[in-house]
């Protein structure tokens, strides 16, 4: 038997004072990660006095460009922008089960198909509540949620490990910087790569400036190598660093530790490559993560007018940083490189777990996989 989404949940329509929020408890479409990646801390808070409220157990879904699949299960109370939908489970409905109903790719496909607008499509709130699902009893809801949660918990553990490794890398690098006896600029250590050579293969992977966030790359599908949008031109390779020219506060950057031979990136992503006798790729990436580097690049970028403040490589290249010659970098470079490889491996494992979860999810929701024998 089937039912509508409105039978198991409602939109939460409460408000909360912006003064009660901080960068951790405020959620907007900009700090929600694509492909069901959860959230990061917000770069800024809204200027309005009140915003939408959510509580622990709600499910938040970005209503702009639903195909980005931005969704988060609220782990605490907070507030969100009006472009984020807040779903609250009805009495008798398992909140985590509701989350997985909404995390199903078929829901995002439906939301995209019924969305309104072309340049910035938004999901239609009325149509969304008419989304058809299988009617599932409470015990089965809990079993489905438990199976899928086990995979998400492992993904969360990997994320926590990587966050710890990032802190270690930053601490180690800060200690080395304190021993530096000279200064250099980013431009003296790196090249701005402008490789627009065509990819010969019939299928390619396209990477937009907002697709990579804080070093996490999405699973990028293969698409036909034809009729590409004009901004998809740049080539990059293993060991390069990608850094968005737009809104650096949003942290759209990443260290490429995979074969990128079939990738094409947006021209809004700088491709930064370490100069071999000046710095290793892992060291250069750590330089670009320095708060003072981000702050200076952001200041230069946001001093320009426009809807989307945009910097350029010249802005980055002129930034001065502490420096010592390569012979003093050997030990720390090896350590940072190993940390980066470990982080990349954890990310890869999480991607595979997410693929397994997304394969199981529709089969569990439809009843194709029988969970009656599962013991909780």
Model features per residue range: what roles?
Residues 79-83, 116-145, 263-268, 303-330:
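A short glycine-rich beta-alpha junction/loop motif
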């Amino acid at each position: 038997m089937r039912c509508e989404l409105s039978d198991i949940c409602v939109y939460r329509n409460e408000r909360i004072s912006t003064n009660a929020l901080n960068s951790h408890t405020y959620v907007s479409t900009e700090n929600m990660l694509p492909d069901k990646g959860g959230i990061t801390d917000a770069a800024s808070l809204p200027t309005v006095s009140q915003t939408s409220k959510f509580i622990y157990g709600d499910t938040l879904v970005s209503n702009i460009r639903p195909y980005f699949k931005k969704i988060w299960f609220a782990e605490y109370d907070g507030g969100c922008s009006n472009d984020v939908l807040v779903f609250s489970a009805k009495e008798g409905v398992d909140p985590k089960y509701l989350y997985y109903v909404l995390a199903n790719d078929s829901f995002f496909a439906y939301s995209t198909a019924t969305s309104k607008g072309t340049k910035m499509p938004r999901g239609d709130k009325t149509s969304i509540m008419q989304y058809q699902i299988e009617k599932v009893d409470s015990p089965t809801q809990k079993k489905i949620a438990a199976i899928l949660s086990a995979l998400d918990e492992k993904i969360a553990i990997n994320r926590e490990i990587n966050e710890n490794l990032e802190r270690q890398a930053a601490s180690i690098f800060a200690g080395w910087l304190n021993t530096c006896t000279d200064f250099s600029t980013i431009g003296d250590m790196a090249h701005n790569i402008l490789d627009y050579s065509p990819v010969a293969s019939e299928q390619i992977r396209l990477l937009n400036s907002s697709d990579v966030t804080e070093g996490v790359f999405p699973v990028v599908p293969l698409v036909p190598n034809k009729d590409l949008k004009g901004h998809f031109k740049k080539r990059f390779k293993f060991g390069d660093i990608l850094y968005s020219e737009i809104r650096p506060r949003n942290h759209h950057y990443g260290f490429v530790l995979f074969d990128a031979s079939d990738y094409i990136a947006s021209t809004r992503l700088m491709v930064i490559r370490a100069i071999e006798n000046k710095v290793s790729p892992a060291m250069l990436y750590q330089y670009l993560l320095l708060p003072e580097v981000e702050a200076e690049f952001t200041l230069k970028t946001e001093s320009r007018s426009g809807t989307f403040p945009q910097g350029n490589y010249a802005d980055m290249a002129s930034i001065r940083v502490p420096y010592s010659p390569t012979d003093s970098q050997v030990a720390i470079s090896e350590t940072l490189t190993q940390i980066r490889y470990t982080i990349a491996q954890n990310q890869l494992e999480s991607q595979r777990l997410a693929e397994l979860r997304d394969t199981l999810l529709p089969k569990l929701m439809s009843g194709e996989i029988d969970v009656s024998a599962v013991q909780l």
